[in-house]
């Protein structure tokens, strides 16, 4: 029957326990509350209102004299119904605030509540980007301080603060490289070298900027060799885009030699900073020969991801690329802080002006600086150390029941492949779906592409040993269950979610973005009579 004929929601309570080192640990994960919820349109209660305001005296004062020709079709509900509806929906979400979030290459760390308190201070939370600069001196000083920290940590002389996320930062860096090459009179350099293990945004960004992508194969050890890079170099190479540590969770030991070879050939070195959390406070990208690198504040510096976002991806730049940084930027003069917003005031080459309508993600700037100041330099070094330690603890604890993709230790994330599932009939997707019933968001699947059936786990530094042991116990339990031949268990997973396995291909290719009110018997009769 249509969901509108059912109760608005149904609640099921479940719990789960796992055995960890001989002790039974009660672990509810994200399974404590599961429910079916009607659409907000299906909860429509004609005549209900949230706030009752006086009607305007004349129609001319309403919508500037305009009047709608037909009802918009928005549902009518009282405020408690709206609050309860969206609260119930939120309880079906998985979030870092509920359980460990092992999504590889995403650095899903805890978002400290102190950062949230700072971001809500009136001097930061209640300002507007179009205010006169003399009224937002504190905000401009904060941007300047954060920029100083990012330059100091990376060893880079300049930073563009406005990019809105990681891929947006890539776009900023590639546009700066494009402009620098044009200024050198070398517009023929339009080939970008990208390792096959790179994030998919790297080749996409290069292509979007008008470059041709040339793929560098990975070595058997998961790394990029300087010999493979040299074989691709030529006078048409614009840059190389390299992630370090790479998406296999491994440090690139020849990165300086690679940078020197690219520079000698006339190209630039763009470093994808997605995995900067593994080296923050310990490695300065400038010392590796980097010309441009985006920094994901929503990863390394703990600002919220996704729906809790937005993201923020400042880009640090070398001396060679600094003149091509986008507007705006903050300067400190004798009269305080000022915001340079126009090319005529910049005194630099500004070939593409702005990347965003305003000045960057101010709320994320506040949170990131609060995080940095809370930790200090020593604390940030501890962050990277603990992130690497936690990943290696998982790798060492699971490699006897799951198949590690490479020999030796990892950096910030542990990479496994599907060899341990061979002969079981269980796929990496089945394994990941079964994790949901155990209270965990799945790890990253089938990425990086250089590993068959990849399962990429990144615990970050904020998880305790107890939490890691619970996760390890669950992974061992599932691996042993798969090897024991319980194929039906995996193919039926997840069982405990309101929705089971969705047709993700159809959802992506044929999304239903508009709710259509179901036909009533009366309207059906009218339509039949018209026919």
Regions found by a protein language model. Name each.
Residues 1-12:
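Short, small-residue-biased leader/transition segments that mark boundaries at the very start
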Residues 13-158, 283, 333-355, 359, ...:
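Non-catalytic terminal extensions of PLP-dependent enzymes
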Residues 80, 162, 194-195:
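Short His-Asn-centered micro-motif
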Residues 138, 168-338, 350, 425-426, ...:
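Conserved PLP-enzyme active-site core in the AAT-like
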Residues 144-148, 154-157, 162-173, 177:
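Long, K/E/R/D-enriched contiguous segments that form extended
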Residues 160, 214-216, 443:
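General small-molecule cofactor/ligand-binding pocket signal
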Residues 164, 219, 243-245, 417-419, ...:
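Short strand-loop junctions, especially beta-strand C-caps/beta-turns
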Residues 175-179, 369-374:
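Short glycine/serine- and small hydrophobic-enriched flexible loop segments
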């Amino acid at each position: 029957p249509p969901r509108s004929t059912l109760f608005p929601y149904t609640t099921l309570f479940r719990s789960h326990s796992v055995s960890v080192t001989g002790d039974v640990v009660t672990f509810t994960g994200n399974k404590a509350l599961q429910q079916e919820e009607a659409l907000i349109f299906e909860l429509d209660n004609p005549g209900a209102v949230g706030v009752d305001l006086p009607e305007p005296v004349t129609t001319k004062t309403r919508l500037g004299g305009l009047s709608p020709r037909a009802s918009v079709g928005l549902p009518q509900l009282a405020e408690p119904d709206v609050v309860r509806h969206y609260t119930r929906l939120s309880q079906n979400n998985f979030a870092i605030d509920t359980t460990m979030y092992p999504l590889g290459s995403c650095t899903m760390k805890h978002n400290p509540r102190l950062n949230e308190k700072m971001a809500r201070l009136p001097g930061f939370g209640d300002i507007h980007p179009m205010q006169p600069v003399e009224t937002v001196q504190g905000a401009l000083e904060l941007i300047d301080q954060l920029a100083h920290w990012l330059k100091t940590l990376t060893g880079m002389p300049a930073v563009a603060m406005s990019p809105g996320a990681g891929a947006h930062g890539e776009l900023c860096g590639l546009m700066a490289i494009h402009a620098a090459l044009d200024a050198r009179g070398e517009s023929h350099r339009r080939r970008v070298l990208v390792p096959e293990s790179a994030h998919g945004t790297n080749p996409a960004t290069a292509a979007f900027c008008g470059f041709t992508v040339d793929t560098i194969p990975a070595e058997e050890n998961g790394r990029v060799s300087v010999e493979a890079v040299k074989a691709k170099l030529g006078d048409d190479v614009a840059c190389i885009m390299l992630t370090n540590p790479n998406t296999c969770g491994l440090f690139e030991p020849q990165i300086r030699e690679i940078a020197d070879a690219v520079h000698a050939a006339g190209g630039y070195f763009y470093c994808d900073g997605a995995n900067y959390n593994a080296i923050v406070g310990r490695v300065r990208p400038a010392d590796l020969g980097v010309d441009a690198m985006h920094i994901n504040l929503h990863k390394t510096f703990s600002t919220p991801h996704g729906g809790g976002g937005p993201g923020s991806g400042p880009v640090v730049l070398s001396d060679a690329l600094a003149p091509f940084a986008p507007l705006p930027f903050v300067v400190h003069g004798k009269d305080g802080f000022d915001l340079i917003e126009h090319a005529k005031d910049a005194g630099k080459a500004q070939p593409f002006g702005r990347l965003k309508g305003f000045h960057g993600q101010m709320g994320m700037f506040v949170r990131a600086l609060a995080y940095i100041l809370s930790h200090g330099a020593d604390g940030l070094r501890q962050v990277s150390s603990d992130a690497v330690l936690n990943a290696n603890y998982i790798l060492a604890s699971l490699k006897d029941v799951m198949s590690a993709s490479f020999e030796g230790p990892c950096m910030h994330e542990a990479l496994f492949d599907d060899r341990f599932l061979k002969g079981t009939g269980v796929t990496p997707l089945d394994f990941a779906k079964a994790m949901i019933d155990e209270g965990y968001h799945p790890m990253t699947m089938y990425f990086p592409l250089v590993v068959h059936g990849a399962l990429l786990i990144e615990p970050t530094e904020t998880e305790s040993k107890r939490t890691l042991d619970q996760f390890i116990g669950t992974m061992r339990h599932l691996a042993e269950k798969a090897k024991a031949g319980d194929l039906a268990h995996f193919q039926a997973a997840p069982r405990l979610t309101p929705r089971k396995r969705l047709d993700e291909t159809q959802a992506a290719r044929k999304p239903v973005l508009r709710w259509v009110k179901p036909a009533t018997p009366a309207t059906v009769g009218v339509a039949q009579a018209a026919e």
